[in-house]
Amino acid sequence: MLEFLTRLFSKDGGSKNVAKERLRLVLVHDRTSISPQLLETLKAELIKVISNYMEIDEAALEVSLDSSGNTVALVASIPVKGMKRVAGTA
């Protein structure tokens, strides 16, 4: 019984932090009028264009919107595995 109460009232915050991050993303999406579907489409287009020049880890690619005050930034974390040779370059 004590273990249950300890878990119930613990200050672990794991699920609290996840819920807070999800709410933040929803609010940012609402403020910018960008739907999650549009963000996924943008992510797919970024993969397509960047893949022309670099070998990237598509599974680890992350794209999000970050809000700071009145500004919103598109933040992309794109792990690069290597560069591709582009026609016409030495």
Curated annotation (Swiss-Prot):
* Keywords carried by this UniProt record: Cell cycle, Cell division
From the record, give the cysteines joined by S-S bonds: none
Task: Kindly state a single biological-process term from the GO annotations of this entry.
Answer: regulation of division septum assembly
One Pfam family, short name please? MinE
Family of the protein in this entry: Belongs to the MinE family.
Q: What does this gene product do?
A: Prevents the cell division inhibition by proteins MinC and MinD at internal division sites while permitting inhibition at polar sites. This ensures cell division at the proper site by restricting the formation of a division septum at the midpoint of the long axis of the cell.
Question: Which NCBIfam families did the record assign?
Answer: minE (TIGR01215)
What is the designated name of this protein? Cell division topological specificity factor
Question: From which organism does this entry originate?
Answer: Pelotomaculum thermopropionicum (strain DSM 13744 / JCM 10971 / SI)
The taxonomic lineage of its organism, from the top, reads:
Bacteria, Bacillati, Bacillota, Clostridia, Eubacteriales
Q: Which gene encodes it?
A: minE
